[in-house]
């Protein structure tokens, strides 16, 4: 809880994080399920195309996607990437800054990095 060491806390949550992770076509058979619509006699076999919240592997998949994306930004924004890495837990960022201006700078930098992959964040600034 590094954010508690600063007067301004920054918490961010990737909106619909698990739905952002697309499963390769070759791997979708492992996410197969059967569906029967009302009034229909036949059972359909369908496959999920996105990572599901609640599967054991989902947090691992999301973590890999986020880490790979951060690696691609490490050369351009090394300080920001280091800050995000040490403050990120699965899809939640918990950090803090001494001033509101620095907290907003962290927020804007995070948006810039993650918008390239269409990750959307829910942000909160709190004064401790």
Predicted region positions:
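Active-site palm subdomain of RNA-directed nucleic acid polymerases
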Residues: 59-105, 109
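Mobile genetic element proteins and their domesticated derivatives, centered on retroelements
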Residues: 13, 33, 54, 66, ...
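Polymerase palm active-site segment centered on the conserved acidic dipeptide of motif C
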Residues: 11, 95-128
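Short helix/loop capping segments that flank catalytic or ligand/cofactor-binding pockets
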Residues: 19-22, 31, 42, 59-61, ...
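Amphipathic alpha-helical blocks
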Residues: 1-37
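Conserved pre-motif C helix in the palm subdomain of viral-like polymerases
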Residues: 4-9, 15-18, 43-78
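Short amphipathic alpha-helical segments embedded in low-complexity Lys/Glu-rich regions
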Residues: 15-19, 84, 124-128
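Short, well-ordered loop/turn elements at secondary-structure boundaries
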Residues: 3-6, 14, 27, 42, ...
